[in-house]
């Protein structure tokens, strides 16, 4: 059972950004490029949430749930994301992206499955797949920063 001490932030998001502004600037540039990439904003948020769920990053899950809600991503897609394979609410393109997200996020546990690559490739051009993979890699990087430092999740209405 977690204690208050075991969930206390080790470093806050704002403090992290102030400590390494060059990193924050670089990540913001990647985010800006991805926003202009043509990959649907709703899909980008779904993959960010899914990778963050897998990596156990509370800050990133909440941050991207907030963004997804602002984009009016249907509630059932957010509610069922952890069980997306069985949910039946995702398009084939979304399902392929979510499967690819899991393949890339869990890279250390297995090699990338050729069949998963073939499935995602039928729904994404070469450029789109490269951009999708950059987006997945970026959120994995953020997860590996935010989770160890226990950034406080940005819960709407909570004092930050």
Label each PLM-derived region with a short phrase.
Residues 1-160:
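Hydrophobic alpha-helical segments
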